[in-house]
Design a protein with these regions (language model features):
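Non-catalytic, mostly N-terminal accessory regions of nucleic-acid modification and defense proteins
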Residues: 1-135
């Protein structure tokens, strides 16, 4: 992609987060980080699945095999209708992210202990998810 196209997409994502009720720049970055992390762990899970397929050896997965855990993957919620996506992300995906690391003393766990998801507008969240997917 051309740099100006990427810049415009990033700017639109930023504006969509603001439209979702987050106005402080550090909070915009924080909320985008949560969403990008959700996308990244799904991509990592896909890499694990491919390694498992190619090697024939069982790998350690991020997500369980149950339908409920698979629903937490970016690829499985990115196309949801706005209200359903917002409810699913806030009630299930974000909680999963917060509890992902079982080591309560890690920096990751300490940081996420008091984390809150602040994009309050379902349509704004849907636009941000779509924007991140299109980058």
């Amino acid at each position: 992609m051309l740099p100006s196209v990427v810049k415009n997409k990033i700017e639109q994502i930023w504006l969509d987060v603001i439209a979702g009720g987050v106005s402080q720049p550090t909070e915009v970055i924080e909320q985008l980080t949560y969403l990008m992390f959700a996308k990244q762990i799904d991509e990592r899970e896909a890499d694990i699945e491919m390694a498992e397929l190619l090697s024939g050896e069982k790998q350690s997965h991020i997500f369980g095999e149950s339908r409920e855990e698979q629903a937490l993957r970016w690829r499985n919620f990115k196309g949801m209708e706005a209200r359903a996506l917002h409810k699913h992300f806030v009630d299930r995906v974000f909680i999963f992210l917060i509890n992902l690391n079982s080591n309560e003393n890690s920096a990751f766990s300490r940081y996420l202990k008091h984390a809150t998801f602040k994009i309050n507008e379902p349509l704004a969240l849907q636009k941000v998810v779509t924007g991140l997917e299109d980058l």
